[in-house]
């Protein structure tokens, strides 16, 4: 579809965000840390395994989506953009 639609002014894109810090992510992270360590505050330590040592922000994903929706990204189509600070590359995926 990404190769068929651009001449009609339609771009086909997918954004695949990694671990993004939201209220729900914090709740789940605290629960996982409580289960693993018996201390919900240690969930941030678990993020140290990520390449950036932290989760991404909603704003970081929004910035990428804003760019993709702009005329500056008119040449981008038919792709999935993973936003995860290299987690999938580190994992060999």
List the predicted regions and their residue ranges:
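A conserved structural motif in NAD(P)-dependent oxidoreductases
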Residues: 36-39, 50-61, 72
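Hydrophobic packing within well-folded, soluble alpha/beta domains
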Residues: 15, 61-68, 76-78
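Short, small/polar-rich loop/turn modules that mediate ligand/substrate recognition or access, typified
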Residues: 6, 11, 76-78
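Conserved alpha-helical elements of the SDR catalytic core
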Residues: 1-5, 64-65, 69-72
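Short C-terminal tail/terminal secondary-structure segment
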Residues: 66, 77-93
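Conserved SDR Rossmann-fold cofactor-binding beta-strand/turn motif
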Residues: 11-17, 21, 69, 82-84
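A glycine/serine/threonine-rich, flexible loop-to-helix segment
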Residues: 7, 20-49, 90-93
């Amino acid at each position: 579809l990404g190769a068929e639609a651009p001449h009609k002014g339609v771009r086909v894109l997918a954004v695949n965000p990694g671990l993004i810090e939201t209220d729900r992510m914090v709740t789940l992270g605290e629960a996982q840390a409580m289960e693993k360590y018996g201390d919900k505050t240690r969930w941030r330590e678990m993020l140290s395994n990520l390449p950036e040592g932290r989760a991404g922000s909603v704003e970081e994903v929004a910035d990428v989506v804003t760019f993709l929706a702009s005329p500056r990204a008119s040449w981008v189509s038919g792709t999935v953009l993973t936003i995860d600070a290299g987690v999938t590359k580190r994992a060999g995926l």
